[in-house]
Design a protein with these regions (language model features):
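Generic "edge-of-domain/loop-turn" microfeature
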Residues: 55, 282, 301-305
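Extended amphipathic alpha-helical segments with heptad-repeat/coiled-coil character used for oligomerization
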Residues: 290, 294-325
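A glycine- and small-residue-enriched flexible loop/hinge signal that marks low-structured segments
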Residues: 1-243, 252-281, 287, 295, ...
Length: 339
């Protein structure tokens, strides 16, 4: 019998299926059958969140899991949270890892056009969304967040002071800035693009994602094809030469602007890179134990966080070319703005 399409059917009394779902349910178990977060084990997922999980005591386990699986956990503090409270939470939870992105609970509004209402949601959903649309060398800093119509603070007419943004940038957290404070245009954007690590060489989101991307590459099927092959102590051993050629070739592709999606004429890594796979790191004693070692070093592209313009003007100014480059010691702690 054909369905009746002439009149709309109104559904009522349904549920969203979240009855009985707790933070413990979201965390799950790491035994077979794996459940919750642990269902992601060996799934090659790039980033994940556990929707609206609020148990601070779980954060350390989440960070450890993300590190072990080469993933990045993306979470936000409770709705309406303050910067100082979020900073305290990060410290009390023992969060100091590149594999955890912690966003302030200045929750985001988005317009549900189908139902004609604005909905308030955890900002981690926009964190997941933006990194899912960026190649791993890109940082979400100052990237337009499509779909965000407001945040709790912007609705109340509250902007972030320079002091507050400095705390965000140096405290291992992030937040969503309103359009009037995004440096590149009139849109909502993330303020720091930093993970929860205190290591300044590793606290950018691009560090986490590029590192995870390259680690997964090193564990790819192409690299795995060397398992079971033979290796000799001869200087011209083909197994080692082919392993080096594989990683040299891949590095060359990463450095190519074409592979970097043509962004600003850049690739995904900087040059030069280094690949070592010879007798210097594969002596006979290690070969006898079944090991093949390859040392791979790459330099990531650096994110522009501070655009500093040194200006002098006036009718009595003598124009000279400055040949002395600035030193990092000259600069105070900036906050990701063009100045």
């Amino acid at each position: 019998m054909a369905p009746t399409l002439s009149a709309p059917v109104t559904l009522a009394g349904g549920t969203d299926g979240d009855a009985g779902v707790t933070d413990a349910t979201l965390m799950g178990q790491d035994i077979v059958p794996r459940k919750g977060m642990y269902a992601f084990r060996n799934s090659l997922v790039d980033c994940f969140t556990l929707c609206d999980l609020s148990t601070i005591a779980d954060y350390a386990a989440i960070g450890a899991f993300a590190l072990s699986e080469s993933m990045m956990g993306i979470f936000a503090s409770p709705s309406g949270d303050t910067i100082n409270n979020a900073l305290g939470t990060r410290i009390s939870a023992g969060l100091d890892t590149p594999w955890f992105w912690y966003i302030l609970g200045d929750w985001t509004y988005w317009y549900d056009a189908f139902n004609g209402v604005s909905r308030l949601s955890n900002p981690s959903m926009f964190g997941i969304g933006i990194v899912g649309n960026l190649s791993p060398q890109q940082n979400p800093l100052n990237k337009p967040l499509q779909g965000v119509s407001a945040t709790q603070r912007s609705t109340a007419g509250q902007t972030y002071s320079d002091t507050e943004l400095s705390l965000v940038n140096t405290g291992g957290i992030d937040t969503v800035k309103p359009p009037q404070q995004s440096p590149g245009g009139y849109y909502f954007s993330f303020a720091s693009g930093r993970n929860s690590s205190s290591n300044t060489a590793a606290n950018g989101i691009e560090y986490t994602r590029m590192t995870n991307f390259l680690i997964r590459t090193a564990k790819s099927k192409a690299a795995g094809s060397f398992i079971g092959r033979l290796q000799s102590i001869q200087p011209n051993d083909q197994t080692r030469q082919q392993a080096k050629a594989l990683f040299d070739g891949f590095s060359a592709q990463l450095a190519s602007p074409m592979v970097g999606l043509g962004l600003n004429g850049q690739g995904m890594i900087d040059t030069p890179w280094s690949v070592v796979c010879d007798l210097t790191n594969n002596p006979p004693a290690l070969q006898a134990l079944g090991y093949l070692f390859l040392y791979w070093q790459v330099r990531y592209l650096n994110v522009v966080r501070y655009f500093v313009v040194k200006f002098m003007g006036g009718g009595n100014v003598t124009v000279n070319v400055q040949n002395t480059p600035p030193a990092p010691q000259q600069l105070a702690n900036p906050i990701n703005v063009a100045a």
